[in-house]
Design a protein with these regions (language model features):
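Transmembrane-cytosolic junction motif
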Residues: 32, 36, 126-145, 244-250
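Transmembrane alpha-helix boundary/anchor motif
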Residues: 20-24, 123-133, 237-241, 253, ...
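Polar-ligand-bearing catalytic/cofactor-coordination segments
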Residues: 138-222, 248-273, 297-315
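Hydrophobic membrane-embedded segments
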Residues: 1-125, 140, 156-166
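Central hydrophobic cores of alpha-helical transmembrane segments
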Residues: 40-45, 231, 276, 326-328
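Post-HEXXH active-site segment of zinc metalloproteases
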Residues: 221-252, 271-281
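Extended, hydrophilic extramembrane loops/domains of integral membrane proteins
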Residues: 83-84, 282-292
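Cytosolic-facing loops and C-terminal tails of multi-pass membrane proteins
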Residues: 2-5, 31, 92-130, 268, ...
Length: 328
């Protein structure tokens, strides 16, 4: 633990270099990669962020990363672990360098760095815990959707996305836009004001359909799990502005990927209508107050990017899909 602070900072520097390379590569291949491929690349990079917390032995006679990973590979045949074991030498070299430099730094500096880092973690954990409590309170105050017409529309949307599970749908007075929330027991929540506007005829069933399809695509692609991972990364990397930018970009890519998934279900003549739904409800679907929810909401800048994505969207060809998979 004495040299952990320096090793962690060293790993952050290396991670930033890799992250800069990834962002540059994605910008270079932006036209070759679909929104979903861009998002998937970012998710894969999240695995790199656990490297500083993996156990590494500093003593030559102790078990090194390569030994641990090789043993793990021989036990469960995990391909990814085998790949990492091949880089064990480089990882140990980084560890040895961190140990040699950290021993030259006074102990109180290590202690001070860990102290401030821990304070930040405590604050971020508190904010994350508060978000979990908000989601729980949202569920406690919500009621099962009673509108028969909307329930029938929801069943149609489930069939459109070929969902194998019927996700419960609730109504609530504490939201401005529909959201998907709940890690173990996901649910979709519709704002009561949208239901009232639908009954009054000021919102069409088409608008509600697009919103429901958007939430169901979040569920289908396990975006809630990714959302929890993103918030966990925020906790431990609260001090790194490049990581914050990267996580913000993942959220933007998630919405672009979700929009593209919805558009793939629609006819080409419906693309404009879907974009109009985002524009017409831009004020209503402001940012959700709950960070752990998935919704169609976003700030004006994000909505502008999504509208441009919708305007330029076209169904990917077979060659484009193969090219994207090969790049990823």
């Amino acid at each position: 633990m004495i040299y952990f602070s320096f090793r962690f900072l060293l790993c952050n520097a290396i991670i930033c270099i890799f992250l800069g390379s990834l962002l540059g590569l994605k910008n270079l291949l932006q036209r070759q990669l679909s929104a979903r491929m861009q998002y998937n690349l970012s998710i894969i990079f999240l695995a790199v962020l656990i490297v500083p917390f993996l156990p590494i032995s500093s003593a030559p006679s102790s078990i090194s990363w390569s030994h641990l990973l090789t043993a793990s590979s021989s036990t469960n045949g995990d391909i990814q672990t085998t790949f990492l074991s091949g880089n064990g030498y480089n990882l140990d070299k980084i560890n040895d360098f961190a140990v040699s430099v950290s021993t030259q730094i006074p102990t109180f500096i290590h202690t001070l760095l860990v102290f401030f880092w821990s304070i930040g973690i405590f604050i971020m954990f508190f904010l994350l815990y508060r978000s979990v409590r908000q989601v729980n309170a949202l569920h406690s105050s919500a009621l099962p959707l009673q509108n028969e017409e909307l329930n029938a529309l929801y069943i149609e949307c489930l069939n459109e996305v070929n969902s194998k599970h019927t996700i419960p749908i609730y109504s609530t007075a504490f939201l401005k836009s529909p959201v998907l929330a709940g890690f173990l027991h996901p649910r979709i929540y519709l704002p009561i004001h949208l239901i009232s506007d639908f009954n009054a005829g000021t919102i069409s069933s088409t608008d509600i359909r697009y919103m429901l399809l958007h939430e169901l695509q979040h569920y289908k692609h396990k975006d809630i799990l990714i959302g929890y991972l993103i918030n966990t990364v925020h906790v431990f990397y609260w001090f790194n502005p490049l990581i914050w930018y990267f996580l913000k970009r993942i959220r933007q890519e998630r919405e672009l990927a979700c929009d593209s998934a919805v558009l793939q279900l629609l006819k080409e003549t419906e693309y404009k209508s879907y974009g109009n739904t985002l524009i017409n409800f831009a004020e209503t679907i402001a940012l959700s107050p709950f960070p752990l929810t998935m919704g169609i909401s976003g700030n004006i800048k994000q909505l502008k990017g999504r509208i441009l994505n919708i305007a330029s969207f076209h169904q990917p060809t077979f060659k484009q899909k193969i090219r994207g998979y090969l790049i990823c």
